[in-house]
């Protein structure tokens, strides 16, 4: 489908512009087609979060601006756009401005290799999973730069907490992704999804039982909890612990500079949820191989599964208390990393037996 659209556009534009213009324009069109809906989802995820948490606390949530509060994200965006960006006198101006940029860029760049269907991706590269692991690890630099450049004790302490926490849980997440790589035999995101559509259960129509979440259940749980820590979401949000260090590395930011951190956090939350769906929950594959389910387009299945995972993120925030910082470090280093290493060996040994279900 993407190739057909490209060929059609090339035929229409070929006689108007030089041959080198259309490929560049096509890349820009694909980038906008991915990022524009993403920004809309990020905006309305904030509304859904406030509504969902309001429901758990027997409140209505935002309901003043627009019908049922549907225009609240637009009002929030306008408010942040019109606020002044204040740079502290003692701050390092260059680093202070670079921090939010370095934080949001990896959160957006990782979407380049996320497939929305069998042939629908901004860039369908063979090392897609490796690209995501590499690009998302750069976000910690933005947090450190923001904390250092602010020249504030609270910001610096929050940045140190964030960097230690993100690096710690990246190791466990990396081992989880290595296990998925072993069973799928590919770093290509599309191949990883398609490999989950085969097996004994899938041959009987129960595709959801052949997805990676079932045979790799401990890895799935570790990945999900590590995703909470990696995105600094509750109960791992000691980075911006309101009762201790106000807002962590973001304490000196205002206006759109603060909004960029905000956008990065929610874009990352959607990203790790989509990755969870692609790696463990069958991506765009329907849960049951029957006409009742397969007529629904794959991108809708992907969206529905992602919505469920994101909602679980919000449920965790409204349910569990915040961990102490030492508890977070202990969980990452003494529990998750050993568990993932053990399962790495178990899955490797399992694949060498006659009972290998991933052949």
UniProtKB/Swiss-Prot annotation:
GO biological process entries: aerobic respiration
Signal peptide boundaries: none
Enzyme Commission number(s) of this protein: 7.1.1.-
MF terms in GO: NADH dehydrogenase activity; oxidoreductase activity, acting on NAD(P)H, quinone or similar compound as acceptor; quinone binding
Membrane topology field: Multi-pass membrane protein
Record key words, sorted: Cell inner membrane, Cell membrane, Membrane, NAD, Quinone, Translocase, Transmembrane, Transmembrane helix, Ubiquinone
Subcellular location per the Swiss-Prot or TrEMBL entry: Cell inner membrane
GO terms under cellular component: plasma membrane
Catalytic activity: a quinone + NADH + 5 H(+)(in) = a quinol + NAD(+) + 4 H(+)(out)
InterPro entries attached to this UniProt entry: NADH_UbQ_OxRdtase_su1/FPO, NADH_UbQ_OxRdtase_su1_CS
Principal subcellular localization: membrane
Superkingdom as given in the UniProt entry: Bacteria
Stretches that traverse the bilayer: 16-36, 94-114, 128-148, 167-187, 205-225, 261-281, 296-316, 331-351
Biological role stated in the UniProt entry: NDH-1 shuttles electrons from NADH, via FMN and iron-sulfur (Fe-S) centers, to quinones in the respiratory chain. The immediate electron acceptor for the enzyme in this species is believed to be ubiquinone. Couples the redox reaction to proton translocation (for every two electrons transferred, four hydrogen ions are translocated across the cytoplasmic membrane), and thus conserves the redox energy in a proton gradient. This subunit may bind ubiquinone.
Assigned protein family: Belongs to the complex I subunit 1 family.
Complex formation: NDH-1 is composed of 14 different subunits. Subunits NuoA, H, J, K, L, M, N constitute the membrane sector of the complex.
Protein's UniProt name: NADH-quinone oxidoreductase subunit H
């Amino acid at each position: 489908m993407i190739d057909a659209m490209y060929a059609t556009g090339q035929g229409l534009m070929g006689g108007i512009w030089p041959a080198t213009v259309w490929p560049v324009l096509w890349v820009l069109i694909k980038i906008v087609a991915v990022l524009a809906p993403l920004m809309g989802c990020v905006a309305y995820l904030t509304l859904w979060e406030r509504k969902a948490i309001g429901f758990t606390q027997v409140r209505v949530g935002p309901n003043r601006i627009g019908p049922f509060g549907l225009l609240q994200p637009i009002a929030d965006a306008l408010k942040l756009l019109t606020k002044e960006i204040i740079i502290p006198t003692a701050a390092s101006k260059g680093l202070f401005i670079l921090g939010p940029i370095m934080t949001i860029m990896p959160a957006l760049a990782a979407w380049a290799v996320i497939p929305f269907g069998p042939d629908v991706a901004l860039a369908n590269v063979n090392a897609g999973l490796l690209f995501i692991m590499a690009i998302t690890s750069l976000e910690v630099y933005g947090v450190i730069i923001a904390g250092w450049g602010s020249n504030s004790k609270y910001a610096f302490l929050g940045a140190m907490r964030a960097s230690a926490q993100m690096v710690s849980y990246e190791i466990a997440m990396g081992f989880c992704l290595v296990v998925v790589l072993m069973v799928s035999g590919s770093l290509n995101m599309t191949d990883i999804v398609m490999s989950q559509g085969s097996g004994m259960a899938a041959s009987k129509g129960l595709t959801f039982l052949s997805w990676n979440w079932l045979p790799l259940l401990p890895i799935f749980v570790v990945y999900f909890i590590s995703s909470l820590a990696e995105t600094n979401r509750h109960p791992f949000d000691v980075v911006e612990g309101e009762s201790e260090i106000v807002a962590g590395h973001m304490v000196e930011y205002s206006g759109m500079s603060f909004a960029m951190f905000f956008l990065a956090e929610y874009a990352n939350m959607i990203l790790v949820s989509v990755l969870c769906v692609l790696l463990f929950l069958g991506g765009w594959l329907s849960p049951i191989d029957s006409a009742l389910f397969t007529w629904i387009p794959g991108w809708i299945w992907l969206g529905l599964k992602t919505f469920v995972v994101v909602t679980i993120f919000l449920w965790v925030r409204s349910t569990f208390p915040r961990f102490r910082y030492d508890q977070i470090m202990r969980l990452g280093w003494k529990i998750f990393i050993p568990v993932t290493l053990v399962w790495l060996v178990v899955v490797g040994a399992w694949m060498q037996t006659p009972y290998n279900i991933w052949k």
